Amino acid sequence: MTSKIAQLQALLYVAGDGGIKKEQLRDLLQLADPEIESLAKRLQEKLASDLDCGLQLLEINDEYKLTTSGEVSDLVEAYFNKDLTKNISQSALEILAIVAYRQPITRIEIDEIRGVNSSGALQTLVWRGLVKAQGVKDAPGHPKLYVTTDYFLQYFGYKSLADLPVIENFEDSSFDADGQVDLFAENGTADEAFHKMEDL
């Protein structure tokens, strides 16, 4: 009979990029939440300790998924032939900060906060998988609403949006005298993540 870890790994594999929610695992594996969390932690440690394994287990918003590990990211990017070496612009960083803290938000609302047109930089974020359109606003023209993606959380090491540093009065205090914004200025660990964003 296969072990519970083997069963979990198989389910994660067939779930693919979409991942699998904790409640689904609870039903399929017939385990309580604490047991699932313990099992997931054991699998995480097993994958991390295996130098011949290029996978890792992530938990995002009570959903588990298998992804490629950071050690093989360059190879994976080369496989998909996606130009991720080009530095992301300061405008895109500002927009990403706004979307992260004000989502769901329309492009017009982003423009109003920044005072300039954001179309090009916003599309760059969509292309890079950090932001996506999700639904429309109940307003004239039904403009698209934008939110951050699971990849955004994954990239910066957050489990959910609740882990983002708290910024009071976002519209008024988060931009400096030059109109720039530091998305993760509140603490050291998050600040490191911001610099990682600049290197995208």
From Swiss-Prot:
<keyword id="KW-0132">Cell division</keyword>
<dbReference type="InterPro" id="IPR036388">
    <property type="entry name" value="WH-like_DNA-bd_sf"/>
</dbReference>
<keyword id="KW-0963">Cytoplasm</keyword>
<dbReference type="GO" id="GO:0005737">
    <property type="term" value="C:cytoplasm"/>
</dbReference>
<comment type="similarity">
    <text>Belongs to the ScpB family.</text>
</comment>
<dbReference type="GO" id="GO:0051301">
    <property type="term" value="P:cell division"/>
</dbReference>
<keyword id="KW-0131">Cell cycle</keyword>
<protein>
    <recommendedName>
        <fullName>Segregation and condensation protein B</fullName>
    </recommendedName>
</protein>
<keyword id="KW-0159">Chromosome partition</keyword>
<comment type="subunit">
    <text>Homodimer. Homodimerization may be required to stabilize the binding of ScpA to the Smc head domains. Component of a cohesin-like complex composed of ScpA, ScpB and the Smc homodimer, in which ScpA and ScpB bind to the head domain of Smc. The presence of the three proteins is required for the association of the complex with DNA.</text>
</comment>
<dbReference type="GO" id="GO:0051304">
    <property type="term" value="P:chromosome separation"/>
</dbReference>
<dbReference type="Pfam" id="PF04079">
    <property type="entry name" value="SMC_ScpB"/>
</dbReference>
<dbReference type="InterPro" id="IPR036390">
    <property type="entry name" value="WH_DNA-bd_sf"/>
</dbReference>
<dbReference type="GO" id="GO:0006260">
    <property type="term" value="P:DNA replication"/>
</dbReference>
<comment type="function">
    <text>Participates in chromosomal partition during cell division. May act via the formation of a condensin-like complex containing Smc and ScpA that pull DNA away from mid-cell into both cell halves.</text>
</comment>
<dbReference type="InterPro" id="IPR005234">
    <property type="entry name" value="ScpB_csome_segregation"/>
</dbReference>
